[in-house]
Amino acid sequence: TNLSGMGHRVESELVANVIAVQVAADQQVAVGDELVLLESMKMEIPVLSERSGRVAEVKVAPGDVVQEGEVLAVIGD
């Protein structure tokens, strides 16, 4: 989701456990870079960046349980 002036919100597509966070705030990312690794029903699901930019904010940490639609990170320009 892109909110004008706020960056691109990377959201979880399902209820899952956060296994790993692969990026940090202020880190530069490219399209296809792995941002977060989720686990649901014994399957690992990598969350990839859909745009290039700088990580403005990471909203989750390993061990967190996220809901569908929950914001994982925000990517700025």
What are these regions (language model features)?
Residues 2-18, 34-50, 77:
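Short beta-strand-turn/beta-hairpin segments enriched in glycine/proline and small hydrophobics
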Residues 13, 20-24, 28, 57-60:
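Short histidine-centered loop motifs in beta-beta connectors
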Residues 24-35, 62-72:
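Short, well-structured beta-strand-loop connectors
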Residues 49-77:
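Short hydrophobic interaction/assembly module
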